[in-house]
Amino acid sequence: QSNDPGYPFGYTISLCWELRPNNYLSITTSIMHSNSNPIPYADGWHPYFTLGGPVDQYQLQFDADTQLEFDADLIPTGNKIKDERFLQKQSLENIFLDNSFELAPNGKCVLSNQHLQLDVVPDEHYPILQVYTPEHRKSIAIENLSGAPDNFNNGIGLLMLLPNKQ
């Protein structure tokens, strides 16, 4: 429906969660609308993961060498910062994150500890990786996003869905 003042566009969304062999979870989002004009949209997930034990015992690696610069309110400024810390496996001991990174095409993220490994493999429609370590240090948020935070205002990665397209 289009009666939400924060997002006044009607649309239909469907989510398909598919568990495949070898513990592979595939999540597919499909959005469609019948408005006469294109509508803005962005998609992303905000899952928290734990591998058991504190985050300080985890390692993180992902295919990104660029971080989006944030202002004091954690809104992207449009500037980019070189950040190659996670191109190789990096311990998360005493590392606190609340950052957005630009993933390389076909990039992935690997979270591991001495017992488990989690691979997050977003497709090309999710070029932003948001990583957050809460103060309690018992989990980590690894979010694949179609655009940067606040993209309805800053336009970074904002997508436009054409009428009757998916």
Can you annotate each of these PLM segments?
Residues 5, 63-71, 75-78, 143-161:
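Surface-exposed, gly/pro-biased binding rims or lids
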Residues 113-149:
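Glycine-rich active-site loops that engage anionic ligands at enzyme catalytic sites
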Residues 14-16, 100, 156-161:
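Beta-strand-rich interaction surfaces with strong enrichment in secreted/lumenal proteins
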Residues 38-40, 48-123:
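Active-site/ligand-binding surface loops and adjacent short beta/alpha elements
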Residues 18-24, 51-56, 133-137:
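A short, structured loop/turn motif at beta-sheet edges
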Residues 14-16, 26-30, 59-61, 108-110, ...:
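Beta-strand secondary-structure signal
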Residues 29, 161-166:
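Short Pro-Gly-centered flexible turn/kink motifs
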Residues 2-40, 45-47:
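Acidic, contiguous internal or C-terminal segments within carbohydrate-active enzymes
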